[in-house]
Regions:
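Charged, low-complexity intrinsically disordered terminal segments
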Residues: 2-254
Length: 254
């Protein structure tokens, strides 16, 4: 009888360890999933303000300082970017990669695409913070950035949305500094595979408009992503990336 109990206990622990990966956006305190979350940190602030899908009526104070390692939305959402989990994989891009001296890039884009290898679960984090997050080295918010204003957006998505995101990112040529997403997960995503391999679009079109939706079955949010390459004749010779995001109470252009 006792042996049977321990067998059940072992199985229970294994199930929890297997399925507890974080590959979705999180609520204000990082204690539950959210379809989307946005943090705006004004210059000189530590916590910033947050609005998220579960409490979209108004902005609230952040649950913790962004430098805290836990108990706030983005610390939890990035839990398996800064730490290991066998079923959570990601691609990270940043024009100022962690631990790399100042380098010149063609893009200012910063973000992370996270997915689960054992479920149709993913998230896209877009932000403005240089040197953040550092892959697999623990949560480490760059405290020097508290003096500056920053925006962080997290969208919970299905894996099928990743290819459209990649199609837009291809044009702006982000600097990818980490990718451990297995090709078996992206076999049907030609744009993502080109992005991961560092391929550059040299043929028109040089502008892109992609549309994705968040995962919520009850109230999904539509997101339009506009991008333009340096080869585009429809503007100055620079890379640009614009994301329009709205819900009933929120509108952002990033």
């Amino acid at each position: 009888m006792m042996l049977a109990f321990f067998n059940v206990l072992t199985l229970f622990l294994f199930i929890n360890l297997t399925y507890s990966q974080t590959t979705k956006c999180q609520n204000r305190a990082g204690g539950g999933e959210a379809d989307w979350a946005i943090v705006y940190k004004a210059p000189g602030q530590d916590n910033g303000k947050i609005i998220e899908a579960n409490d979209a009526a108004a902005w609230n104070n952040g649950a913790q300082a962004l430098s805290n390692r836990d108990q706030h939305s983005f610390a939890k959402a990035l839990e398996h970017v800064v730490g290991d989990h066998q079923n959570a994989k990601f691609l990270a891009y940043n024009n100022a990669p962690p631990g790399v001296p100042s380098i010149k890039t063609k893009s200012n884009s910063k973000g992370v695409i996270i997915l689960a290898t054992n479920a149709d679960s993913a998230a896209w984090v877009v932000h403005t913070v240089p040197g953040f997050p550092a892959a697999k080295t623990g949560y480490n918010w760059p405290v020097a950035e508290n003096a500056r204003g920053h925006l962080l957006i997290c969208l919970t998505i299905l894996e099928s949305q990743i290819n459209a995101i990649a199609a837009s990112l291809l044009l702006v040529q982000p600097l990818i500094h980490y990718n451990d997403i297995p090709k078996t997960e992206t076999a049907g995503m030609p744009y993502f595979n080109k992005l991961a391999e560092g391929k550059i679009s040299t043929l028109p079109p040089f502008t892109s408009r992609q549309t994705i939706r968040t995962q919520s079955g009850a109230a999904p949010v539509t997101v339009h992503i506009y991008s333009k390459s340096e080869s585009s004749k429809y503007g100055e010779h620079e890379l640009s990336f614009i994301c329009y995001f709205w819900s009933k109470s929120t509108f952002f252009k990033v």
